[in-house]
UniProtKB/Swiss-Prot annotation:
It comes from Glaesserella parasuis serovar 5 (strain SH0165) (Haemophilus parasuis). It comes from the Bacteria. K(+) binds at E43. ATP binds at H15, D164, A165, K166, R230, F231, D239, R245, K246, A262, K266. InterPro entries: ADOMET_SYNTHASE_CS, S-AdoMet_synt_C, S-AdoMet_synt_central, S-AdoMet_synt_N, S-AdoMet_synthetase, S-AdoMet_synthetase_sfam. Homotetramer; dimer of dimers. Disulfide bonds: none annotated. L-methionine binds at E56, Q99, D239, K270. This is S-adenosylmethionine synthase. Mg(2+) binds at D17. CDD domains: S-AdoMet_synt. GO terms for molecular function: ATP binding; magnesium ion binding; methionine adenosyltransferase activity.
Amino acid sequence: MAINLFTSESVSEGHPDKIADQISDAVLDEILKQDPKARVACETYVKTGMALVGGEITTSAWVDIENLTRQVICDIGYTHSDMGFDAHSCAVLNAIGKQSPDINQGVDRANPLEQGAGDQGIMFGYATNETEVLMPAPITYAHRLMEQQAKVRKSGKLDWLRPDAKSQLTFIYEDNKIKGIDTVVLSTQHAEHVDQKTVFEGVMEEIIKPILPSEWLSQNTKYFINPTGRFVIGGPMGDCGLTGRKIIVDTYGGAARHGGGAFSGKDPSKVDRSAAYAARYVAKNIVAAGLADRCEIQLSYAIGIAEPTSIMVETFGTGKVSNEVFVRLVREHFDLRPYGLIKMLDLIRPIYRETAAYGHFGREHFPWEKTDKAEALKSALR
């Protein structure tokens, strides 16, 4: 009997890095609405009193970067200077240039199916049957706590809540099966006038208890709610934020490997993003088909080359067939060339801003979460 602990964290939509991600993806969405062929690599930096939007964008679209940036910050909830960041008064700086023609000539082709990868790199996808969304439980419930924090904050039920927050969950596993939750950490920015007792009780009753299944909690579960005792200064006033700095929060909470490439602000020609989505799609369909309890996919690409340079499948001893057979199945049933996976998942759409908070995976309405290949995979092995 092997017992171990595993921990994952999430952050709220008001965390500085997530503000940056949401601005970058909002810019991407607005451009894709007007110009599906745009090439976008948009980066954002936020700090007290300012947001800097930069990167390389080649497009026929026009986007009011300043107003869009202010709208995103406002939607998150930073609408008054007493929060340390105000959508209405912060400076918005624009430092956007064009994509290098050296990159462009390797990506664009007369035949779309020959479209090359926008860069070299490695990408991972993962799925596990330990939750109904085929995601690891620690990251899934850490995200749900953060979604609940935002819901309660925006409803006004706890009017002292502010946008910046973080969660962290430590799960107990016995022989790779969940036995319970060992530790809950939740820190949330709050108004200056509220005391620690009020914060603790409010967070427990309105955020934690409605989300975490009671069967996973016990008298031994430890709760650390705002453990420093005070969290008034938050958001970009507390820390600067950058696009692409929460890549583990965005994916599997450390339960699977990561290729290192961030997602937000990148159009689907960037395989850092689109191939990571495709790898999740492949892994999820293998698990949904009942062919493995856990599955990790690695893909790799070379800049300007359409076919993946490698495909790896790992099922951690839970697969119904060998990993070599899985690789053959993947090649037969999934088109993992850049244009192929874009078509397969219908990625040239303005769907990205929503991905930029609460995780890119495990939310069923995104196209890479479909399990429409599961039956075909099962049939191929009969």
